[in-house]
Each structure stands twice: as structure tokens, then as C-alpha cells.
Amino acid sequence: MPAWGKQKDYNQIVANMAEDYDRMHTLLMEENDILRSHIEQLQLQVTQLNAKLGMRSIFELNADKKPRIIQLVSSLNFGDAVGNDALAIKHMLEGAGYATAIFTFAVHPKIKEENVYNIDLLPELTEDDIIIYHYASEDGFQKLIEETTAKVVLRYHNVTPPEFFHGYDEKAEIITRKGLVQIKGMKDAIDYGIVVSDFNKKDLIDMGYQCPIAVAPILIPFKDYEQEPDKDVVTRYSDGKTNIVFVGRIVPNKKFEDVIACFAAYKEKYDPTARLFLVGNYQETDAYYQYLQDVIKKCGAEDVIFPGHIAFNAILAYYKIADLFLCMSEHEGFCVPLVEAMFFETPIVAYASTAIPGTLGGSGVLVETKEPEMVAETMNRVMQDAEYRSEILKKQDERLKDFAYESIRGQILDEIEKVQQSKIDKVRKQNGEEKAD
């Protein structure tokens, strides 16, 4: 049987094993450590099976295609902005004719994607290969990055400052603190940067990075957003009441408490029928979620809804019914939901922090204060002043064009061409040859 045929049979075996992961999906999304251990064991079995059968990845079978481009991401999570970016880049590279694959320590069971492998299957790399290294938190790739002969391109998504987690999540606080130390310590091992925002570029420069750093936003396949939103959600909440929405993981740096406080002020003074939808995954036992429940009680806010873990088409439905997108986050490396709100023509009111002004690029409404009454006044103007609202949406539509798939695709491919050329120059220098003019 030819190698590609063996690979096809092997992929089916892996797919069958992946079905066993599905039954663990709910608990996995809740970050159950025991369950993650079970999944790692299953993935180890896949690795052992691969070795036993003598299989080779498609990536290895294309070893003669130069350059091969691999992406490293600590974990490939379902619905995660970093994972989505890695998958979108993979599809883009495949479409451009590159031999490419993603290597990771763990893959979410909902992700059924070819050429995604456990890191144990990483083949030997050469100076002709290119690594795109996604970084958002401490991971186990540092030794590989520091020792590889391949060209290393850092796709930096930023690390949440650990102080945000203090008092809420000790584990996250430790991981993020180690992550900041780790990323700073790898500055001499990185050859090139393609970061997702100017804020992230400045962050690396402040850490002492001296390699060339380009900015290319997260690659968003907007065709995915054209599917039909969840009809039940749209029908239930299209009743004439004002729907305020924020989308993001329920974590402290997103400052959900400030969203709730501003909503409560708006509801009390301007619109008693308004509702607030806080769309993001959480566990009811999380200390931060419990804190938010206390905030809601203290504010006396009613109609605050946490939809919880929902399907993608349901997330689209909440964007569809949104009258205003309210973001009070204090740390973002990019903030994809802002672009999603633009796509759904929802006016944005956002606190001017970190990467948010850069992502909005002069669109939306930036507020410099979190004083609830002042933010509520801005919200009310957006809702009541038709001309003002129309101007906001017009600027958001213009800004959205900057994130067009083909535009960002071109930017990333251009940067990869530069990396490829710099790699050839590097090899020539190592061989003592003169560079061509």
C-alpha cells in the first residue's frame, strides 16, 4: 500500500479514537485536570500506535518541499482565538501550496482536522524549515525553540498579567507569571515576529526583543459567520427590548464587573427594560463567577444573563440581537469580539485599554473612564441619537475592511516570504558565501 494510503487508514484509526474524546467534552471545557490527564493518555496511545505501525505524517512525506512550515501551539482549543488563528493560518498556508502542519501538546476533541499532530510526532527539522510559534502563556516548547536550526517566527498573542488572577485563580496566576518570564527569556531564540497588534509589538520591544517584528492581525475567516444564527435565541430576544452584549471568557482581566455596573446605571436611568448578555464559558464554582454574582446583587441589576457554554451559531445569534456591544476589558492582545461586533453591525462602546484602541482603529466609541453614570450616558446617546449611531456604524464598516481575509492573508504571506528570504541569506552567510545584490 502506498504511503498516502497508509496515512489515510491511520487517520481513520485516529478519528475513531477521537470519538472517545467526545464523551468527555463538557468536563474538558470546564478544565477538569483529571480529564485532561485521561486525554493526554489517549493521545500518548495514538503516538505509540503511530510508532508501532511505522506511519509517517503528511508533513514528513513532504520533506522535499521547501520550506516546510510548522505551527507550534501549546493546546488547540475549540473556539479559542489562538487556536482559531492557528487553524486559519494552516488553511491559508495549504492554499498557498506550503507543506504545513500543527504540532501541539493537546487537541480539543471537537476539532477534527487533518495534519494536526501531537508534539511527539514532530519530525527532525532543518535550517530550511520555518516554525510559527504561537505564544499566549507558559508552555513546554522553550527547549525546542532555543535548540532548533529552523527559523523561528513568533506569533505573539500576549500574556495576561498575573495580578488580574490574584485572589481568584492561583493556578492561572502562577502560569501567567511564569509565562512572562519565559517569553522574555526566549528573546534571543526568536528570529522574526509576526504579532497580532501594535500593542503586542511594543510589549516585545519593551522586553528587549531586537528581531524584526511585523504586525498582521488575527486571520478571521468571515465565511464562518455567514451561517444561520440560532433561531431560538433570535426569536426569544427579538421582542423590542434593548439587548446589551459582551462576548469573552469569564476571566478577571475582562472586567465583567465593570460591564455589569455600567449596565446597571444605564438600566436604572435610561432604559428599565434593557437586558445584559455576558456570553462566555465559566464554571459556577469559579471564584470570579461567584464574585460577579455578588456584584449583580450589590448593583441591584436584574436581567443579567450568562448563556454559558453554547454552540457557535448561538454565539452568532447573540451578536445578531445585540443593540450595543459593551467592553470594559483592561487587558487584550487583540480582542476578536470587537471585529465580530463590527461584522454584525453592532455599535461598540469600549474602554480604551491595551490593544483595544488599535483594534478599533478610530471606529466605535472609546471611553477613558469607567465611572458607571458617564459610561451609561454614552450608551444612551448611542441608542437614542440616530445620526450619531449611523456615523459609528459607518466608521466600523470602514475599519472592518482592514480585517478582510484576503488582506490579512496577503500580509502574512508577504511576511513569510521575507522570513524565507532571510533564512536563505542566513544559510549563505553560514556557508561563507556572498549575498546576491
What are these model-predicted stretches?
Residues 104-108, 273-290:
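Glycosyltransferase donor-sugar binding loop
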Residues 330:
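Aromatic "clamp/platform" in nucleotide-sugar-dependent glycosyltransferases that forms part
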Residues 194, 235-254, 260-263, 277:
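Conserved donor-binding/catalytic core segment of Leloir-type glycosyltransferases
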Residues 289-313:
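Nucleotide-activated donor-binding/catalytic signature segment of Leloir-type glycosyltransferases, i.e.
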Residues 309, 317-322:
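Short alpha-helical donor nucleotide-sugar binding micro-motif in glycosyltransferases
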Residues 338, 347-350:
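Short hydrophobic beta-strand element within catalytic cores of glycosyltransferases
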Residues 365-372, 381-386:
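Conserved acidic donor-binding segment of nucleotide-sugar-dependent glycosyltransferases
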Residues 187-229:
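Donor nucleotide-sugar binding/catalytic pocket of nucleotide-sugar-dependent glycosyltransferases
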